[in-house]
């Protein structure tokens, strides 16, 4: 497996990873990976979007994996499995909230 990489390369890998696992729950879920501003070269902000709904919602902290941690562990299957579980749980929560919103409308 692979690890390491510069900030941009790791950001692309993380965006693909999050997208892949979120879409396993629903192809309509989109990944948002924030990699600019205060986070640049330090960490990433991860959110998921389904329609107009975003989790974690704006104004609250996103999932925030550290650049060094992602870079060092992206080749570690156990670490990737733990991150995939977090992403998929967030996607399931987003889908459930959207369904509930449609039912009550």
Residue ranges and their predicted role:
Residues 50-85, 89:
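Intrinsically disordered, low-complexity regulatory segments enriched in Ser/Thr/Pro
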Residues 1-37, 71-85, 105:
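Negatively charged, low-complexity tracts enriched in Asp/Glu with abundant Ser/Thr
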Residues 83-105:
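Intrinsically disordered, low-complexity regulatory regions enriched in serine/threonine/proline
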Residues 13, 58-60, 103:
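Long beta-sheet-rich domains in secretory-pathway and surface-associated proteins
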Residues 38-46:
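A short, glycine/Asx- and small/polar-enriched loop/turn
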């Amino acid at each position: 497996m692979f690890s390491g990489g510069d900030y941009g390369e790791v950001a692309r890998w993380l965006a693909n990873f999050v997208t892949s696992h979120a879409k396993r729950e629903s192809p309509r879920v989109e990944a948002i990976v924030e990699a600019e501003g205060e986070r640049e070269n330090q960490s990433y902000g991860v959110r998921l979007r389904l329609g107009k709904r975003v989790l974690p919602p704006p104004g609250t902290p996103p999932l925030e994996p550290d650049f060094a941690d992602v870079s060092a562990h992206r080749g570690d299957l156990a670490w990737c499995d733990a991150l995939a579980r977090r992403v998929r749980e967030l996607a399931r929560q987003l889908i459930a909230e959207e369904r509930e919103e449609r039912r009550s409308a």
